[in-house]
A protein has these predicted regions:
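Switch/coupling sub-region of P-loop NTPases
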Residues: 5-115
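Active-site donor-binding loop signature of nucleotide-sugar glycosyltransferases
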Residues: 37-39, 89, 128, 145-148
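Short flexible/disordered coil segments
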Residues: 52-55, 75-82, 120-129, 150-152
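Helical/strand "switch-coupling" subdomains that flank nucleotide/phosphate-binding cores, especially
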Residues: 75, 102, 113-139
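NTP-binding/hydrolysis catalytic cores, primarily Walker-type P-loop NTPases
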Residues: 131-174
Length: 174
């Protein structure tokens, strides 16, 4: 999230929501329009996301989606607000299922499944490796695009095992 945040245009309002201040958007992107929110026991992620939607953001960046707050994040993104978050999974193709499993009820999951493919554009899987000197480095292992064309949800792989596999971008993604 922190790395990709540098590509957000400076005139677009960004709201970051974190429990520990890791993104530090205003420090890494000085002069850009930003409101940083910190959640705690009295002001949780769901409260912060709902509050942020009243502040006319172009972007909502959540440090990590872990639980039921993903429902409010998806609802926010489905209004046209863009966003970024991190979540733990072993394959980008599992992102939709991972999100559905975070939702509190089956009704929420059924209602929001299509929103995942409409509101999310890209999934990126970052892995860690050690080089011969023992230094840890991160690399992009997988990239996919989420799309909803007609009544069908699609995952289009662009990078697999760190290699570009998509030769031509589908028209629906441009």
């Amino acid at each position: 999230v922190k790395f990709f945040s540098q590509y957000v245009p400076g005139n677009e309002r960004v709201i970051t929501i974190e429990d520990t201040m890791e993104i530090r958007y205003s420090v890494t992107n000085p002069g850009k329009d930003c409101i940083e929110m910190r959640v705690n026991d009295r002001f949780d992620y769901a409260d912060a996301i709902k509050t942020s939607l009243r502040l006319n953001p172009k972007w909502i960046m959540l440090s990590e989606a872990r639980s039921k707050e993903v429902k409010y994040l998806l609802e926010g993104w489905s209004t046209g607000v863009r966003g970024m978050t991190a979540l733990h999974t072993d394959d980008v193709r599992n992102i939709p299922d991972r999100i559905l499993n975070m939702l509190e009820t089956r009704v929420d999951a059924d209602r929001l499944e299509n929103d995942i493919y409409q509101a999310m554009d890209v999934g990126v899987l970052i892995r860690k490796k050690k080089n011969e000197a023992g230094q840890v480095y991160r690399y992009i292992d997988q990239v996919c695009f989420f799309d909803r064309e007609g009544q069908k949800n699609k995952i289009i792989m662009a990078v697999t095992d760190g290699k570009l596999v998509l030769k031509e971008f589908p028209e629906s993604l441009l």
